[in-house]
Every structure is written in structure tokens, then in C-alpha cells.
């Protein structure tokens, strides 16, 4: 499992810093204007008595293009080759089809261009609600955490809920809490299996819980204005986070953990063929893996000297420790879980395996 930020204290300090530095606005798109110079696109926001200016981040560029109906490949070409045309296109469509949008900014940068009904489930509040629950769960410990440009992650294992896949090969139950403040996915609580022998984490999609960022529509006004937490919103969020606390407290489920362990054991009996290079190429095409990821998986697949489906799953999750980006590392852990489920289910349908009955 890839290690992110060093300590929970470091994580909390960064979340507090971001809380102070961020600014969220609701703006009529007619009050917005972009201007691109020397490869940098700035967006200005008229608030009535002032004009605020922010540099567009990469995610905001993509969200802006999508909302305005500009094909992203063409958007990027204008951005690189004809920035004046980009500005004309964006400013024209912002004015022609006016609507309210939420602008999320941090450190002078527009990081998200979202619906005005987007519910702000902030990372600091999430951590404040989730960490006390984790601390009260017997044997639970945060073993990896990070805050990236797009997501917050807390990866937790329960040291008391463990079993052997085969003698000497121990796995522990756990879960992952993740959240995006910029519209790149729901707040999720996903089951995790942690293999001690190689420190691999595998995320299962089967029993994941999701909470979506959909909230109330904001008031109607022509001028942009800053969003603050009001008492009604705070009350709504309290109820919401109480539900999240309930999900987290029940995230380590022994019956579901045992079902995943049974699938891991079943995967040991599934052969992947006689050509590991071809096996990894097929895998790479199916899950859109880049050359470095394919090379890493192949290396671990061969070094593990286990060419069963179980060995392939472990090669994928082990490769997550080799990538630089924490988001991508987590996605490879999810791919490992999906690969396990699909391989075992496919073998069972062909009559090659008999799966245990669901709990």
C-alpha cells in the first residue's frame, strides 16, 4: 500500500490551512470573464463592488469545457495554439447561456466549476467526524492517508479481524474513506483487504457505500457572492455526517470480509495461461494501463512466480506502490478488486469453480 502524507497530524494541519485559504462563490456566468496570456488562463468574477481574479486549474478547465459544450480536444487545441479564440468561445457561451455556478477556489486558483446545487462536504469536517469513530473501533488504525489535488483518502485496517488465505499468508480487513471537494466523485466508504506478506491493499467495489454531493439550490441574484456556512446548512451537514459515521462504524463486516477471502482462495485455482506477457497486455488493454504500469505489473507477476489469477491480482495491487500519484495508486488497488471479482465470477459461470453461498 502506497504511503501518502506522513502523519494524521500533518494531514490535519494541511486541511486546516486549506480551510483558511479557500473561497467558495456562487456566480451568474454573465459576471465571469476569462483571459489567456502566456499559457495562463485567468477568470475574473464581478461581485458587484469588486472584481476577483483566479488562475484556472486543470480540473476547472475540463469542467468549464464540458459545461459549455466545447469538445475538450478542441478546447485544449485553442488553449495551446489560439488562446484568443479560446477566450472568445468561453466568454461568448458564458454570456449566451447564463446560469448560476459554484466556483471553488484555493490559493488563488479556480479548482472547480460546479453546479450551484453542489453540496460542499469538506474534508476537514469529514475527518473531524470520522476519526473519532475510527479511534473507538477495536483494533482499527489509519495506515495510510493523503490529500491530493482531487481527493482526500483515509485507509484503515482492523488488526483484530484477520485470517490466513493459506498457512502463513495473513490478510486483514479494512476500509477506505475517500472524498472529492471538486466534483470528481461521491464520498465513498469501500472495503479493503490488506495482505501482510507484501503490504498490498485491495479495494472491493461490491460492498462500497456512496454519499452524493447534491444539496439545495442557492438563492437567486445577479451578482457573485461568497458562500459561508449557515446554521441551516450546518444542521443538514450534521445529519449527513452522522449517516457517514454509521457507515464507517459498520464498514468492517466479518461476513463480507470472509466472502472476499473465499474469492482470493478461489482465485488460486484459476490459471491465467502460459504467457504472462500476453496476460498482462490483455489486462492493460482492458483497464487502460500505461506502459510503466504494465511493466511494473509484469515484473511483479514474474517475480511472484504465481501465474494463477490470485498471482495476477497481487501483481496489480503490488504495482500500486510503484506509481508516484496517490490517486492512481488507489485506482490500481480498485482495479485489483475488480479483477478478482470478474475473474472468479467468470470462472464460476463456466463451472470451473463453486463459490460459497452469500451470507
Each language-model region and where it sits:
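Intrinsically disordered, low-complexity regions enriched in serine/threonine
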Residues: 1-88, 144, 148, 159-359
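Sparse, context-dependent recognition of short Cys/His-centered cofactor- or disulfide-binding micro-motifs
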Residues: 49, 111, 115, 139-141, ...
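Generic amphipathic alpha-helical segments used as scaffolds and interaction surfaces in large
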Residues: 51, 55, 113-121
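A short, surface-exposed helix-loop junction/capping segment
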Residues: 94-117
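Amphipathic alpha-helical segments
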Residues: 116-141
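Extracellular structured ligand-interaction cores
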Residues: 151
Amino acid at each position: 500500500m502506497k504511503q501518502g502524507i506522513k502523519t494524521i497530524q500533518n494531514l490535519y494541519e494541511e486541511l486546516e490551512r486549506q480551510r483558511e485559504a479557500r473561497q467558495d462563490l456562487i456566480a451568474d456566468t454573465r459576471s465571469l470573464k476569462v483571459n489567456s496570456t502566456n499559457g495562463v488562463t485567468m477568470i475574473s468574477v464581478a461581485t458587484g463592488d469588486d472584481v476577483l481574479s483566479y488562475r484556472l486549474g486543470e480540473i476547472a478547465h475540463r469542467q468549464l469545457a464540458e459545461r459549455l459544450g466545447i469538445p475538450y480536444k478542441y478546447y485544449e487545441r485553442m488553449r495551446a495554439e489560439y488562446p484568443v479564440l479560446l477566450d472568445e468561445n468561453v466568454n461568448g457561451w458564458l454570456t449566451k447561456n447564463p446560469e448560476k455556478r459554484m466556483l471553488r477556489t484555493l490559493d488563488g486558483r479556480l479548482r472547480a466549476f460546479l453546479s450551484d446545487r453542489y453540496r460542499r462536504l469538506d474534508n476537514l469536517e469529514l475527518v473531524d467526524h470520522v476519526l473519532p469513530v475510527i479511534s473507538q473501533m477495536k483494533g482499527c488504525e489509519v495506515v495510510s492517508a493523503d490529500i491530493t489535488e482531487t481527493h482526500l483518502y483515509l485507509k484503515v485496517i482492523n488488526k483484530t479481524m484477520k485470517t490466513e488465505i493459506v498457512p502463513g499468508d495473513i490478510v486483514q480487513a479494512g476500509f477506505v474513506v475517500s472524498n472529492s471537494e471538486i466534483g470528481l466523485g461521491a464520498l465513498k466508504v469501500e472495503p479493503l483487504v490488506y495482505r501482510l506478506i507484501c503490504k498490498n491493499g485491495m479495494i472491493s467495489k461490491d460492498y462500497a457505500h456512496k454519499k452524493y454531493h447534491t444539496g439545495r439550490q442557492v438563492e437567486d441574484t445577479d451578482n457573485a457572492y461568497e458562500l459561508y456556512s449557515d446554521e441551516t446548512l450546518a444542521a443538514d451537514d450534521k445529519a449527513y455526517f452522522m449517516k457517514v459515521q454509521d457507515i464507517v462504524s459498520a464498514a468492517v463486516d466479518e461476513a463480507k470480509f470472509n466472502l472476499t477471502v473465499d474469492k482470493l482462495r478461489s482465485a488460486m485455482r484459476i490459471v491465467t495461461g502460459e504467457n504472462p506477457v500476453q496476460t498482462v497486455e490483455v489486462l492493460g488493454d482492458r483497464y487502460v494501463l500505461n506502459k510503466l504500469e504494465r511493466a511494473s505489473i509484469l515484473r511483479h507477476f514474474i517475480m511472484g512466480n504465481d501465474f494463477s489469477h490470485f498471482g495476477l491480482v497481487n501483481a496489480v495491487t503490488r504495482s500500486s506502490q510503484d506509481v508516484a500519484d496517490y490517486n492512481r495508486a488507489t485506482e490500481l488497488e480498485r482495479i485489483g478488486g475488480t479483477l478478482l471479482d470478474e475473474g472468479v465470477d467468470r470462472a464460476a459461470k463456466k463451472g470451473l469453480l463453486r463459490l460459497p453461498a452469500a451470507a
